[in-house]
Amino acid sequence: MFKMVSSPHTHSSNLTAKFMLWVMVAMLPALGMQAYFFGYGVFIQVFIALLLAVAIEIAIAKLRRKLTAFYVADLSGVLTALILAISIPPYAPYWIIVIGIIVALLLAKHSYGGLGQNLFNPAMVAYALLLVSFPVQMTGWLVPIDLLNEPPTFGDAISLVFSGVTSDGFSVHQLLGSVDGIAQATPLDSAKTSMQKLGVEGVLQSPIFSGLFANGWWQINLAFLAGGLLLIYKRIIHWQIPAAMLGMFALLSGLTDLLLPHTHLNVVSQLFSGAMMFGAFFIATDPVTASITPRGKLIFGGLIGLFVYLIRYYGNYPDAVAFSVLLANICVPLIDHYTQPRLYGTGR
């Protein structure tokens, strides 16, 4: 006699915790690269974010009278915290990451019912709210430390995060102002503010763009690319979303270069600046808020690439990945509705 059980009859070994853990492992090279170029502040932000995220998950479990392991062991809150911590400036005030984690987990995740119920990517909801509400703190990126006359020590990093100044009394913006030829701290910020004055060639010759790999930003994006390819190889994420996102952006950016030369950064510089690779492989591929159908994934990724192009080239925000992901999240129910695979034996 065979015991009759309901489907599913086969089970995937990709449990939620395993999925989250692999994503975090794939982020470690980029995290290390970011810390190498921007200093100890990266680790301080990550520590605060992870500590608060675990505390919130435990508190929510107790409020809902669930087992603590039910909320903590799936690592979803930890991954959200890590993504947000990497996204914000390393020397942003501590209360920035505190507000961000509270918004991400309480407002954008648990207010919808918890893991699997949220409509929008929690980390990007928090990032977008922080960017709109605290633009000065959220644009306080230091240049790579090899461009600074006196890179912050570990003590300076702690002081900057918790008091806003180094032990010598310098703020982040004062440290940034000590580097000649840099208007803003990231390549995209610098290009956005300096393009009309200096032109493309002048921008590319500035300190933040000089050198083979643009002083750290290329290496960070290459590390995210390598981690993303690992996730595709391990079948943790699908290739359609990052391929469609990067392909759409590269296509539109390339056409702009052909039709309007010398008006924007070239395609390669755009692809390897800001959060492009991070967004393509680690943010847009969130299994809860992304499209679930094969064709839908391509459309979803293409939409993100389109939105990033429009905002970067014609909007006020130089990076645009967070806003683009959130805009595409809105379209997911419609995309999934019209891209459902046809059942065998049924009409179109």
From Swiss-Prot:
The keyword Phosphoprotein applies. It is found in: Cell inner membrane. The keyword Phosphoprotein applies. InterPro entries: NqrB/RnfD (IPR004338), RnfD_bac (IPR011303). One of its GO terms (cellular component) is plasma membrane. Its EC number is 7.-.-.-. GO terms for biological process: electron transport chain; transmembrane transport. Disulfide bonds: none annotated. It is a multi-pass membrane protein. Keywords: Cell inner membrane, Cell membrane, Electron transport, Flavoprotein, FMN, Membrane, Phosphoprotein, Translocase, Transmembrane, Transmembrane helix, Transport. Its main location: membrane. Its cofactor is FMN. The modification FMN phosphoryl threonine is found at residue 186. It holds the Pfam family NQR2_RnfD_RnfE. The chain crosses the membrane at residues 15-35, 36-56, 67-87, 88-108, 125-145, 212-232, 241-261, 265-285, 298-318, 320-340. PANTHER family: ELECTRON TRANSPORT COMPLEX PROTEIN RNFD, ION-TRANSLOCATING OXIDOREDUCTASE COMPLEX SUBUNIT D. The complex is composed of six subunits: RnfA, RnfB, RnfC, RnfD, RnfE and RnfG. Part of a membrane-bound complex that couples electron transfer with translocation of ions across the membrane. Belongs to the NqrB/RnfD family. This is Ion-translocating oxidoreductase complex subunit D.
